C-alpha cells in the first residue's frame, strides 16, 4: 500500500463517521528514513482534525475513538500517529 491509498482509506473512514468537519493527512515518514529499524511499508502520519464532537470528548476519549476507528490501519500500515485538533 502506498501513502495515497492509505490517505484515501483514512479519509473515507473519518468522513463516514459524519462527525469530522475537516481532515488533513500529512506523511511524515521522510523524517524517519534514516532510522535503523525503519520499515518502509509503515507510515508516520500526522492528522489535523476539526470536529465539534471530538472537541466535546476528553483527550483520552477522542484518542480512543480515533485508534478504534483506525485499528486495522494501525496494525498493518501506520507506525506512528500524531493527532492535532484544530
State each model region's role:
Residues 1-86:
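N-terminal, polar/charged subdomain of small-to-medium soluble alpha/beta proteins
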Amino acid at each position: 500500500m502506498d501513502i495515497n491509498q492509505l490517505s484515501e482509506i483514512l479519509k473515507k473512514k473519518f468522513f463516514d463517521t459524519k462527525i469530522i468537519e475537516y481532515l488533513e493527512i500529512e506523511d511524515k515518514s521522510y523524517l524517519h528514513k534514516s532510522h535503523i529499524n525503519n520499515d518502509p511499508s509503515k507510515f508516520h502520519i500526522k492528522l489535523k482534525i476539526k470536529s465539534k464532537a471530538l472537541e466535546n470528548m476528553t483527550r483520552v476519549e477522542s484518542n480512543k475513538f480515533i485508534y478504534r476507528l483506525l485499528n486495522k490501519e494501525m496494525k498493518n500500515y501506520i507506525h506512528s500517529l500524531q493527532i492535532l485538533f484544530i
